[in-house]
Structures are given as structure tokens and as C-alpha cells.
Amino acid sequence: MLKLDCHLLCTLRDSFRIRQVAGMFDLPVGDTSRAHVRAQLPGLHEPWEIGMIVGPSGSGKSAIARAAYRANLVQPSHWPRDVAIVDAMGDGPIHRITHTLTCVGLGSPRTWVKPYAVLSNGEKFRCDLARALLNAMPKDQVHEDLPIENQPLVVIDEYTSVVSRAIARVASAALSRAIRGKQIPVRFVAVTCHEDVIPWLRPDWVLRMQPGGAEEQSDPKSQISNLKSEISDPSSDSFLGVLTWCRPERPKIDLDIHRVSRDLWPLFRRHHYLSGSLHPAAQCFAAYFENEPAAFCAALPFPHPRRPGWREHRLVCLPDFQGIGIGTKLSETVARMYVSTGRPYFGTTSHPGIIRHRVRSPLWRIVRPPGMVSPVSRAEMKRTGMARFCSIGRITASFEFIG
């Protein structure tokens, strides 16, 4: 365990306005501001993956984080105004950059090619998170080469402070899923005043900063002595960190899936990685999370001379809900419904995150592995009745749902 006992001192220049405020509110004013912060934290040699320092503003969270993890504390960084975010993520290979962006819940290729300045606060938060993780990750080792004790540490202060609580919960779940699933080989400490993300981030330990003279000592004389010292110096603040080991279960994610009209498509159109169009014959479905539309899926009849069936036409998850599997759950629910008609259900995609999921999932069978699609001749189009492939020139993969 790492024991920290921090005495914070700050000299104060006297002024007429300070005296005015002190007189108005009967405040004691000295020439020095003092704070005493104490805490015990797990050491870096211990086998934990995610930690959290939480408490109200001014309770010493940042002071403890700086004292314990100064070298690993992420500092605000500059984003060029005219450079796409994929070009501002460092020198790593593109597959690592897109993989990390997808892991933190920013899985839209259309967003990847935008500059940071035009993104929403939620998207900016995930970009900052992805770049911090990428900068910490080793460049020459694969995930399996690093035991937990040797993985780099990333510490972020004011975690989720600038985003809505819904985005904070979803982003925390996405990050926890990526770290626990060994997709991102780092350890992570969040410093925040928001306790609502604890069950979503699922930390191994939580340090709660509490104001006042609470002591870990059992000796009453020691407690009385400390209390007297605080009363005698009202300009001094005292805070104690209480450590709890835990890994709470993530709250259950309840989705409501409904057949919807195509009128809902404009909400999702600009977030589709390929096209904003929707076929007139598309049958549309949406997943709702906490009564908010989160994901959209559309299917079409799939004409084939031997195995006619259905195919996935569009699959979109809104940026605020990416990273926790809502899109894939909607896709598989819709696929299962169509397979129950006795006809096969196919899906073709070029999105790296979806391809990665379906390759690993027992619910999908690879029909065509990732690669370029050959052009279809006019004779073949006439024989099969199929339109010319729109995925020519792109790396795609085709799957059949077998779940």
C-alpha cells in the first residue's frame, strides 16, 4: 500500500477586498492557506486494473492524484483545428488508432475524419480519452506480453465532468469493457466528483475523500488532539481518504426494441459510416435505452436463385451510446427474428469493429472473409437478379446469422 500524508500550503497576499469579505462574513483570514490530506492507495505492484478517487470539489482528490501518480496524470493537450482526429492521434498504425477509438465508444468513421473542434462535448471527451490511452500504450508489445503489474498507467482528473451523466455512464462502461477484455493494455485511474459512474466503470478500488477530522486511528486521545488542532487553526482544512476494494456488477442494460417507420432514419443518417440513403423497401427497427432512441437497424429481402432470404441494410448506433454493445444486440435480435421465418439472414460490413465482433461471435458464420469484392458482370446480374455490388473497392466481410 502507498501511504500519503500531504500538507498543502499557499501564501495569500492581503488586500482591501479580502478584508471586506472577511468583515462581511466574519471569516478568519491568515497569510497562509493550509490543507492536510491523508490517504492510502494500492501500490503499482498490486494486481488491479481500474481505480477511482472520488469526492466533492475541494476535498483533495487532485492533490492525492498528483502525489501518487504525477508522472501518469494526463495533461490537457492541443488539438489542431484543421487536422482530422485520426491524424492527431500520434504515430501509431491506423488499425491501433481506429481500434482504440472504437473501444472508447467512438466507432463512427465519419467522426474519425473530422477535426476535433467540430465535435460535440461527448465526442471530444472520448477523443481525449482515446489519445491518452494511445500515448500510454507500448509501441512494441502486444497485449498478452504485459502482465497487469507492468501495464502503463493512465490517470485522468475531472473524469466525465464536462459531459452529460448518460454519456458518462455509457463511456465508462465502454472503457471498462475494453480494459477488462484486454483490448487496451493499460491500467486506469479516474479522479472525479461523480459517484454515479462507479457501477459502470467497475473499479477494483475506490478512494472516497471525506472532509473533517475522521481518523483511521482507534485511540480516542489521538482523535481529540487532532480535533483541537483543527479548531485552533480554522484556516486549515483536513481530508481523509477511505479506501474500499470492490468490483461492482455493471447495471443491467435494458433495451426496448420496436419496429419503427422510416421517419426515424434522419436522426441516424449522418452517423452511418457509409451512406445516408435508405432503401424504399427497408423494414426498420430501433433500440431505445432509457426511453431514448439509441440504435437503428434496417433489413431488406435478399433475392437468390438457391437461398433467398434477408440481408442487413443499415446498422447505426448514435455516438452517445457506442461502446457497450447496443448496436450488435439490436442487429442480432433483428437477425434472430428473420431467421425464425425459415430463411437465412446475411450481413455485409466494412466496419472494423463489427467485423471483429462477428468473427469472434458464435452467432455468426463467415461467408466471405475480409477482402475486396470482385465486380459483378452484367450477365451475372441478369442471371441472379442482384444489383451490382456497392462495396467494390472496399474491404468488406460477409456473415450469415446462425444463432
Whereabouts are the PLM-identified features?
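Conserved ABC ATPase signature
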Residues: 113-124
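A conserved beta-strand-loop-helix scaffold within acyl/acetyltransferase catalytic domains
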Residues: 259-321
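ABC ATPase nucleotide-binding domain signature region
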Residues: 8, 37-106
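Conserved GNAT acetyl-CoA-binding A-motif
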Residues: 336-352
